[in-house]
């Protein structure tokens, strides 16, 4: 249904379903060739969920203003992969097991993927002088009823 498209959930798990979906979208009216996304905006920047699938997880992006830190949480099962596509970032990590800490600095010139691992609290800080834009993949869709995101000092 087009309502699933608006919820940004995709289910293309095999070649038959892929072909069926491709056929379905060829019948969409022109008015449904595009749709708006919801932007969650505050003084830190914006966060936008782009694609969701129970099979491949979720793709989102965020922006952060200079000096802003986002995150400061951990997950039990959620894996995340971050790619800075504009700006400079510092990722901080703290092990929940032994309090070990470390940092990773990266920027858009490196094209380096930084992963958050379950059991490690993490945050990301814009250490540059301009807006930072980060592409984010998570292995599971955010579920407001079971968020698997727990605030924790890094």
Predicted regions mapped to residue ranges:
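Anionic-ligand-binding alpha/beta catalytic cores of soluble enzymes and soluble regulatory domains
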Residues: 13-22, 26-29
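A short glycine-rich, His/Asp/Glu-containing loop-to-beta-strand
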Residues: 33-72
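Short acidic-glycine-tyrosine-enriched beta hairpin
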Residues: 96-118
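Glycine- and acidic-residue-biased ligand/ion/polar-headgroup-sensing regions
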Residues: 77-95
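Short beta-strand His + acidic residue motifs that chelate non-heme Fe in jelly-roll/DSBH
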Residues: 47, 71-73, 91-93, 114-116, ...
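Double-stranded beta-helix
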Residues: 97-100, 125-154
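Single conserved hydrophobic/aromatic residue that forms the stacking wall/gate
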Residues: 1-12
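A short beta-loop-beta micro-motif enriched in histidine and acidic residues
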Residues: 56, 68-81, 108-110
């Amino acid at each position: 249904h087009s309502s699933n498209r608006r919820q940004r959930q995709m289910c293309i798990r095999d070649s038959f379903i892929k072909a069926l979906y491709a056929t379905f979208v060829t019948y969409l009216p022109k008015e449904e060739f595009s749709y708006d996304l919801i932007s969650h905006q505050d003084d830190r920047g914006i966060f936008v969920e782009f694609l969701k699938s129970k099979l491949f997880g979720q793709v989102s992006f965020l922006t952060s203003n200079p000096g802003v830190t986002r995150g400061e949480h951990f997950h039990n099962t959620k894996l995340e992969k971050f790619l800075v596509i504009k700006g400079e970032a510092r990722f901080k990590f703290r092990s929940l097991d032994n309090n070990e800490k470390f940092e990773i600095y990266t920027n858009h010139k490196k094209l380096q993927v930084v992963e958050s691992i379950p059991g490690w609290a993490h945050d990301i800080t814009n250490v540059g002088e301009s807006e930072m834009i980060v592409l984010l993949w998570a292995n599971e869709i955010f579920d407001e009823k079971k968020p698997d995101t727990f605030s924790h000092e890094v």
